[in-house]
Amino acid sequence: MDPARIDAEFPAPSYRGAQEAALDRIREAFEAGNDVVLVRAPTGSGKSLLARAIAGCARRAGEAEPHQPVGAYYTTPQVSQLDDVAADSLLDDLSIIRGKSNYDCILPGESNTPVDEAPCARERGFDCPVEHRCPYFSDRAIASNRSIAAMTLAYFMRTAGSDVFGRRDVVVVDEAHGLAEWAEMYATIELTPGRVPTAVWETTPPPAVNGLRDATAYAERLAAASDRRLTELRAKAELEREEVAERDRLTELIRELGWFVEDLRDEDSTTTWVVDQPDGAGTAVVIKPMDPARYLHHTVWDRGARFALLSATILDKAAFCRASGLNPADVALVDVPHTFPVERRPLYDTTRGKMTYEHRDETVPEVARLIVRLMANHPDEKGLVHAHSYAIAERLRDHLDRFGVGSRVRSHDSESRDAALSAWKRSSGADVFVSVRMEEALDLEGDRCRWQVLCKAPYPNTRDSRVARRLADDQWGWYYRSALRTVIQACGRVVRAPHDYRGTHPAGSSRPGPFERARPDMPGWVADPVAPPAAPGPPALGPDAALGGDHSDDPGGGGGAGGRSDRGGSSSGRFDRSGSDTQDPSDHPLSDVWGE
């Protein structure tokens, strides 16, 4: 790696904000001999451009000895982030490769067949006459030979040990704050009827699993049964599409189970495993790793010589290194200052009550009233509501419909989230999007969104066995940092440029928790807007204020992708004051406007 090239490799024609100073500090960190540089850069600092400059410093083929790695990887956990890279003309020299399922076969009669189900995957010994033109293998060949290959973190991890994507000189991971959590997710083994092929599940059902010894014994039996079924499938000359999927899943399952058993028996492994089987014998078993440093070494740290990890929310260097299996002595942290004026990214104290499960009946209606008032304050501007869970989102939609503003509200389910988000972003109206788990990798610059509500402090779910185990081990710092990290990520969705102005409105009364308890880990640019200005009061507007007139360019208004405008409130969008709604009209969020 030649860090001195970092300025020349910066892809933009000029610097913005603190980019030039950031590159200087990154160069100094690598020149000081650090193998890993953490770059804590806030939203709007141009992390992708910084990442490209770092990747460009990788050793080149003409400069290397035969045994030395060359080139760079750029990887990110978020598919949408990779899409943004693909669409950015400043990053067009990154060669992007995606998984096989993202490409269609080009053989006659197979144009709607994903490559992972094409004849080359179905037929033994199939010799594809157009492999040189296959979109997947073409992209893979180009990416493997170009100086910077770009891919999702999932694809990057799956190709560990690959002859095609071997070790490179530099690895750049964007949105790297959740690296350990992503590794835990990828390394989790779900032994359920939906994940274990039926032929194996029915012949080898789970016994009662009470601890790791039982889990290991079952894993070995299941791996043996899976291997027998895989041998049967491989003996066939041609497979049906369903059998192709079964074969691939069995191959993956055998590898996962083998990794678990091997790691568990490795006396030097630092990974702790937990096992869940809440419903007893014959039901699903989930095997989860905690702090899977060994898994990360195989899938990430062995893939490069130098690493740059970029994120706005790497809050504690020591904790990040501990969770990721890094030696803090080999790691430098570079802080990039925020250059957006703090008055343009305020965080208002608009808490309405506790959002814990036992208090939700009282608090959700209050949060809905807050949303209606904010809709009235922003009659011509889009808003985003982070509901934290689908259950909360559903209840919010019910209350917003009951308040008569449902025609301005959109939502989604687990299947429609991408389509619903895309439709909302494209719309030119002022609809409000009630979302679940969209705190990361969203770019809502400009009129795409002007205000947002955080319904609940996003603490990790204590019913998750990994979370419970960490809290039992007194890892409360991790717990509060996780919530703070999610809040910071959410705030970064809506203020994307210095001229933007967005307000963020936490609604759950536990909001001070992550800010106060994780304050020592809070960057200054995060602490600055955490001031308690008075919540905006209800506007002195008419009853139509929250609907804001023409609020959507779709014929169905809020009934666009994920919308439900046919539910709840009246067709006019007004609160039904005839008595058909059981709520007292005086308790309606716009009752002060009507004078009732």
Describe each PLM feature range:
Residues 72-76, 149-152, 172-173, 306-311, ...:
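Structural recognition of the conserved hydrophobic beta-strand(s) that form the central parallel beta-sheet
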Residues 2-11, 15, 21-26, 30-43, ...:
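Conserved coupling segment at the C-terminus of the helicase ATP-binding
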Residues 127-169, 434-439:
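Conserved RecA-like ASCE ATPase "motif II neighborhood" in helicase/translocase motors
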Residues 459-488, 497-596:
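Helicase C-terminal subdomain and adjacent C-terminal extension
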Residues 137-147, 404-433:
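Conserved motor-coupling elements within RecA-like helicase/translocase cores
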Residues 98-103, 153-155, 387-391, 408-422, ...:
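Conserved helicase motor
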Residues 351-360, 416-511:
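Conserved RecA-like P-loop NTPase helicase motor core
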Residues 33-40, 50-91:
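Conserved SF1/SF2 helicase motif Ia
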